[in-house]
C-alpha cells in the first residue's frame, strides 16, 4: 500500500489508455464505491484540485497513520489517483483486500446524485468503474459493485442514502466507455500548437470551447481532445491538430 499515484489525474479517455499500461492485480475482485461526504459539492464548486489531494494524502498518512488510501477520487469529469491500482488500498475494512476503492465527490445523504453536478460526478464514476471491471475481466453485478455500506463492519450510509445500488449498476451498464486508441497515440498541448499554425490569442479565445467535458475548435468536436484541470491545459492528438486548417 502507498500513495504513489497522488498527483496523477485522468479524463475517462485518458484513464482507459492508462489501464492498458498496467497489469490487472489478481487480488481485485470488485470495485467499492464511496462518497467523500466532506468535502461536499458546495465546498468544492470547481471539483478537486491537486492541492486537495495532497491535503487528503497528508490527512491519511500523518493524522490517521495509514500506509495506503482509496485508489481514486472522482469529480465531474476526472479521476484523481492516490493509491496505485495494482496495490491493495485502505477504504473499507472488509473490502480492502478484494476491492478497488473509489471516492465520489459529494455528500449524497444530503446532496442530489441524480441531477446537476451530482449526476455528472456519478456518470464519471460509473464510466471509470466500467473501465475497471472490463480491465479486471469482471461482470457488472451486485457482487462486483460494492458500496461501503455493504461492509458489515460499518454503520455508515456511504456512498449516501440517496444513492441506490440498482441505479448505479444501471449507470455502469449503460455508461459510454470510450474506444481507446493505442497507448502510442501522441498528444500535445493544443494552444501552443495553434499558435505555431499562426492563430492569434484572440482567435484562439474565440475558437476554442470546452463544453460538458468535450473540446471544440470552431464548433468542430475534437473527439480525442480533453482538458486537464491539474495542469489547466487542453490536449489534443497530433492527428487532430494536423487536420486543423486556418480559415483565411
What are these regions (language model features)?
Residues 1-36, 43, 76-79, 84-88, ...:
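Basic/polar, cationic surfaces and motifs that engage anionic cell-wall
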Residues 18, 171, 190-193, 207, ...:
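Charge-rich, solvent-exposed alpha-helical interaction surfaces
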Residues 47-61, 65-68, 73, 83, ...:
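Glycan-recognition patch characteristic of GH18 chitinases/ENGases
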Residues 65-68, 74-77, 81, 215-221, ...:
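Short, intrinsically disordered low-complexity segments
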Residues 172, 176-178, 229-248:
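Repeat-associated, polar segments at repeat-unit boundaries in modular proteins
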Residues 181-199:
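Disulfide-bonded cysteine-rich modules in secreted/extracellular proteins
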Residues 200-208:
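Short, well-structured beta-strand/strand-turn elements
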Residues 207-235:
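Acidic, low-complexity, intrinsically disordered interaction modules
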Amino acid at each position: 500500500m502507498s500513495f504513489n499515484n497522488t498527483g496523477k489525474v485522468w479524463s475517462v479517455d485518458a484513464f482507459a489508455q492508462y489501464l492498458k499500461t498496467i497489469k490487472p492485480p489478481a487480488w481485485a475482485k470488485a470495485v467499492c464505491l464511496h462518497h467523500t461526504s466532506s468535502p461536499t459539492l458546495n465546498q468544492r464548486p470547481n471539483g478537486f484540485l491537486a492541492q486537495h489531494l495532497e491535503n487528503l494524502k497528508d490527512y491519511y498518512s500523518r493524522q490517521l497513520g495509514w500506509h495506503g488510501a482509496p485508489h481514486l477520487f472522482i469529480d465531474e469529469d476526472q479521476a484523481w489517483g492516490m493509491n496505485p491500482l495494482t496495490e491493495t488500498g485502505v477504504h473499507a475494512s472488509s473490502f480492502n483486500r478484494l476491492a478497488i476503492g473509489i471516492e465520489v465527490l459529494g455528500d449524497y445523504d444530503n446532496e442530489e446524485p441524480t441531477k446537476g453536478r451530482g449526476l455528472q460526478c456519478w456518470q464519471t464514476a460509473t464510466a471509470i468503474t466500467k473501465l475497471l471491471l472490463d480491465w479486471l475481466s469482471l461482470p457488472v453485478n451486485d457482487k462486483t459493485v460494492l458500496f461501503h455500506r455493504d461492509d458489515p463492519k460499518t454503520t455508515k450510509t456511504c456512498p449516501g442514502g440517496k444513492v441506490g445500488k440498482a441505479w448505479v449498476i444501471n449507470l455502469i451498464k449503460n455508461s459510454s466507455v470510450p474506444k481507446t486508441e493505442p497507448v502510442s497515440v501522441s498528444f500535445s498541448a493544443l494552444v501552443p500548437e495553434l499558435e505555431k499554425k499562426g492563430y492569434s490569442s484572440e482567435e484562439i479565445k474565440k475558437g476554442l470551447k470546452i463544453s460538458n467535458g468535450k473540446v471544440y475548435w470552431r464548433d468542430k468536436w475534437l473527439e480525442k481532445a480533453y482538458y486537464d484541470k491539474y495542469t489547466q491545459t487542453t490536449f489534443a492528438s497530433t492527428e487532430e491538430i494536423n487536420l486543423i486548417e486556418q480559415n483565411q
